[in-house]
Curated annotation (Swiss-Prot):
Organism name: Rhodobacter capsulatus (strain ATCC BAA-309 / NBRC 16581 / SB1003)
Acidic residues bias: start-end ranges: 250-265
Catalytic reaction list: protoporphyrin IX + Mg(2+) + ATP + H2O = Mg-protoporphyrin IX + ADP + phosphate + 3 H(+)
Stretches assigned to the VWFA domain: 379-559
Annotated protein name in UniProt: Magnesium-chelatase 60 kDa subunit
Length: 561
């Protein structure tokens, strides 16, 4: 992003930060980002600029009961939260924002009282800001390729900002400008309705910054570059049909037509294709190869950031209580709290005001929180290669292994899911279940043969595992294949592309921390599968003649690991 676009983005953000939602800044920590954040601190925002800790809890966000002051004063004392007054928040390490925090920030941004500047330090393509937050931030700045930055030169003039704020309520948006933005979003593959709304908001602000009260085509193009480039998908579109041949002009009409054309403003109306090309000109060089795959991986991973929490779906036996803070669903261990406060009563009464001799003096440091062991149902997700000549044998082995594991599942509370991939795509035949009757019914008559969409099977297994994890379960992926993938994610036969996509999905599985096992069913160990297992950080097991009992024993051991 060049200097002028950076300056325009900061000017738009400064005029009305709550209206555009905020800024998504992608940059690793270093002098470039430090200079940019120093510039942010000098912008004349209409609201306070406040730093938001990445581990902020609900008590800090919303406020609530101040336990320490309540215990000290003997009556309820409430404290305010960060969201009590309009602010522009700076969120460091935004790529590690949890889904829980992302949902709360999204709700706050919907009120149009706050703005968020997300500092995204993602080092890998599969690390991303939660979608709920990213979708609400109108502006995007990528400093990854920037080598130097002129911080003072990016600061907009204060007089220009104040004049733009005065003009903004008077800015009119013609209907044709709205149509251009909406059609451009459609052609760019942008499905979110917030995208055109944020682009139109940015266009109105740019118009006010120019000292005008009517949005022109150039404002729409400029706004599209600032707000839509990071959302666009590089769709491969068919070339438009050739225009019909022009009709021969009538005599004495050539001069009249030329005079009319001279009076038309070339920017008065723009085809949507111009908006599309303006946005595509802002895309990174490698976006055509990586963006579509990256969107698949983010969708599969839920877009919940690198710091997604793991919770159990069942509560186990009680654990010894520990000192802690009252937050979320924490419960006080009253006996342990009183036991902690008892030895200090004599000292505290001598320091306390008169009239508290018969009052039990408890401080926040005495609070003990009840704990229970988090129990989590386990689920083993089979991704079975059902392609090729050996498909029938592999499927029968998988059927037997699934039924054997289900027979053991009742005591251990394990679940089993079955995915097959053949032809051009993968298919979930059995969602996580412990029902023997349902499983046997689903396993009857499984088809086999066709191509090997290995990447599709791995992606489907990752999606199923993420869904199970979101319900508090502990998933393990078991990939049963000979490793000869030849079908890409789009269903085309391309062995080289299929291998590259399988490697990218393997990296995404590894980044999600999902345990996995790869069972090589080829007659001889496949070196490509060994590399894939290393990329996925999965256990590799060569079982060229895998029987149902042997497979069940191996995968049962993987569950216990």
């Amino acid at each position: 992003m060049d200097h002028e676009r950076l300056k325009s983005a900061l000017a738009v953000l400064t005029v009305d930060p709550a209206a555009v939602g905020g800024l998504w800044l992608r940059s690793r920590a270093g002098p470039i980002r430090l200079a940019f954040t120093d510039t942010l601190a000098k912008l004349p925002f209409p609201m306070a600029l406040r730093r938001l800790p990445p581990n902020v809890d609900d008590g800090a966000l919303y406020g609530g009961l101040d336990v320490a002051e309540t215990l000290h004063s003997g009556k309820p004392v409430l404290k305010g939260g960060l969201l009590d007054r309009p602010s522009v928040f700076i969120l460091p390490m935004a790529e590690r924002c949890t889904a829980k925090l992302g949902a709360r920030l999204a709700q706050a941004l919907d009120l149009r009282q706050h703005a968020l500047i997300a500092l995204d330090e993602a080092a890998e393509p599969d690390e991303a800001l939660p979608h709920a937050v990213a979708d609400r931030l109108g502006l995007f700045v990528d400093l990854s390729e920037v080598r130097s930055i002129d911080g003072p030169g990016l600061l907009p003039e204060t007089a220009q900002i104040e004049r733009a704020r005065e003009l903004l309520p008077q800015v009119q948006m013609p209907a044709e400008r709205v149509s251009e933005i909406v059609e451009g979003c459609r052609q760019l593959g942008i499905s979110s309705l917030r995208a055109p709304m944020l682009a139109l908001t940015a266009a109105r602000i740019l118009t006010a910054l120019s000292g005008r009260t009517r949005v022109e085509a150039e404002d729409v193009l400029h706004a599209a570059e600032l707000t839509l480039a990071h959302r666009a998908l590089p769709l491969q579109e068919a070339p438009p049909p050739p225009p019909p041949p022009p009709e021969p002009p009538e005599p004495n009409e050539g001069e009249n037509q030329q005079d009319e054309q001279d009076q038309i403003d070339p920017l008065d109306g723009i085809p949507p294709e111009i908006v599309v090309e303006a946005v595509r000109a802002m895309l990174p060089d490698n976006i055509l190869q990586t963006l579509n795959m990256g969107s698949r991986l983010r969708a599969a991973s839920g877009g919940q950031g690198a710091g997604q929490e793991q919770i159990g779906n069942r509560r186990g036996r009680p654990l010894p209580s520990r000192k802690g803070k009252l937050e979320d669903d924490a419960k006080i261990d009253l006996v342990a709290t009183l036991r902690s406060a008892a030895p200090w009563q004599g000292l505290r009464r001598r320091q306390a005001p008169a009239g508290t001799e018969r009052v039990l003096l408890v401080e926040s440091s005495d609070i003990h929180i009840k704990r229970r062991k988090e129990m989590s149902d386990r689920v083993l997700i089979f991704a079975v290669d059902a392609s090729g000549s050996a498909a029938v044998a592999r499927l029968s082995e998988a059927k037997g292994a699934v039924e054997l594991l289900l027979g053991r599942a009742y005591a251990a509370r394990d679940h089993v899911s079955l995915i097959t991939f053949r032809g051009t795509a993968a298919q979930v035949l059995l969602q996580p279940s412990r029902s023997l009757t349902q499983t046997k019914r689903q396993l009857q008559g499984l088809p086999g043969g066709g191509g090997t969409p290995l990447a599709s099977g791995m992606e489907m297994a990752m999606v199923t595992a993420k869904q199970a994890r979101s319900r508090g379960m502990t998933p393990t992926i078991a990939l049963l294949t000979d490793g000869r993938g030849n079908i890409a994610l789009d269903g085309t036969a391309n062995r080289e592309l299929a291998g590259e996509q399988a490697t990218k999905v393997a990296r995404a599985i590894r980044a999600s921390g999902m345990p996995a096992v790869i069972i090589d069913t080829a007659m001889r160990p496949n070196p490509a599968l060994v590399d894939l297992a290393r990329t996925m950080d999965a256990h590799y097991i060569a079982l060229p003649r895998a029987t149902a009992h042997k497979m069940a024993d191996v995968l049962g051991a993987a569950l216990e690991a």
